Amino acid sequence: MTYLLALDQGTSSSRSIVFDERGHIVAQAQQELPQIYPQPGWVEHDPVDIWRTQIATARQALAQANIGPGDVRALGITNQRETTVLWNRRTGQPVHHAIVWQDRRAEPLCAELREQGHEPMIQERTGLRIDAYFSATKLRWLLDQVPGARAAAEAGELAFGTVDSWLIWQLTGGKVHVTDVSNASRTMLFNVHSNDWDDDLLALLRIPRKLLPRVQPSASDFGATDAALLGGAIPIGGVAGDQQSALFGQACFTAGMAKNTYGTGCFMLMHTGSSFQTSRNGLLTTSAAQIAPRTGAGHGAPEPAFAMEGSVFVGGAVVQWLRDGLRAISSSSEVQSLAESVPDSGGVMMVPAFTGLGAPYWKPDARGTITGLTRGTTIAHIARAALESIAYQSAALLQAMSRDAVAAGGAPVSELRVDGGACVNDLLMQFQADLLGIPVVRPAVIETTALGAAYLAGLSSGVYAGTEALSALWRAERRFLPTLSAARAQECMARWEHAVRQAALD
């Protein structure tokens, strides 16, 4: 039997999953990742915790599967994107906590860049809007605010990376400083047309090029693990940011195919093939996972692959807020039964703009609201409104995506594949299909983020001949079909847009 090991380093936990070559889960392990909130709007992780929890789960998963490193053909890595790590090349120690993708401390710098008129140039080169969400301004903050960091960076003593780079550095004993194209494309420093770091952007943000990792295709040779870590060396053959990895794991390989991941946030991606498309509807363009040619893996010229993306900052996190903030539930699993205890939200609308609103609105100053309260409102109505807010935000993304697809000469999205922890909530998935008016399809294996990393590693190591073999492995577990009329769905979305305007104080 051939096995693949996927390391899935997320915002709230580190996980490792052993897959067989059919994409079935053989074993898995998970550890929570401590969250650090130094100030309002700031979110950090300790890079040492990231590494400690990730390597521990890898060992646990291998032990649970009762296999050794010699049984694993290759290892794949997928990770929370944009989260920024800066460390000392000699000691391997971080110079500061990692600044997490949710962190908003760099917003003043972003506002300054927008006021200076740089956004059109940045969007054309990177596919991204100027936002504190991305790595570039987080890295600039570290260089400016950590004592001695800029001088050390300019002397070549420091290394920058997103979480994948940090893990590869640790896994290889500091021998390899590298990232993949999908993670690089989320930094706001990477030119997606030239497939390289952009010198003009580096100069604009005062970031020394010598800080940056080498960039490779997502399915290519990233080195091998230090033999002492897992009892033997394992080739690292696949790396992708979590959302591009989920797109790959959902077998969305052709233009027009779309997926939505329901996690801490929600992340919708639509494959656009080899064409770079600039959104006119508030979405981002990002590099999809790229596959190196079989010859000279890691150094060939893969065919470009792009995706349109929309990100919801607060998705499943709204359920955590119900539990930890309002104490309305004692565990996240209770939310479906509580929401199902009422037939609808009773007119309550929740906009969970706790850290502003992401795509397609891009309202960093928006704040969370609950409207439509009456004397008859119960906590069940609020719970249902919280769940529905996840679907409303995702529906706004898909509608924007379909408009962009039609403008580019394509067709609207006709089916949405779903994954992530919250996709097991049948109430949420049915309401999502009702709002969208298209089938929402849940796969047999919902761990598609980790599966995508395993598939990438399998491609580079020869387990799979190509993406056609992966498409043949994909299976649906359930299709949710719309039950609302188009007119009723439009009424619901109109109420949502009104609530968004209130939250944004428009």
Curated annotation (Swiss-Prot):
UniProt KW keywords: ATP-binding, Glycerol metabolism, Kinase, Nucleotide-binding, Transferase
Entry GO terms, CC: cytosol
Name a GO molecular-function annotation: ATP binding
| UniProt: ATP binding residues | T11, S12, S13, T264, G316, Q320, G421
Q: What is its EC number?
A: 2.7.1.30
Q: List the signal peptide residues.
A: none
Binding of glycerol, residues: R81, E82, Y133, D242, Q243
Q: Its domain of life?
A: Bacteria
Locate the residues binding sn-glycerol 3-phosphate.
T11, R81, E82, Y133, D242
Q: What function does the entry list? A: Key enzyme in the regulation of glycerol uptake and metabolism. Catalyzes the phosphorylation of glycerol to yield sn-glycerol 3-phosphate.
Q: Which PANTHER family does the record cross-reference, listed alphabetically? A: GLYCEROL KINASE (PTHR10196:SF69), SUGAR KINASE (PTHR10196)
Protein name (record): Glycerol kinase
| Native source organism of the sequence | Paracidovorax citrulli (strain AAC00-1)
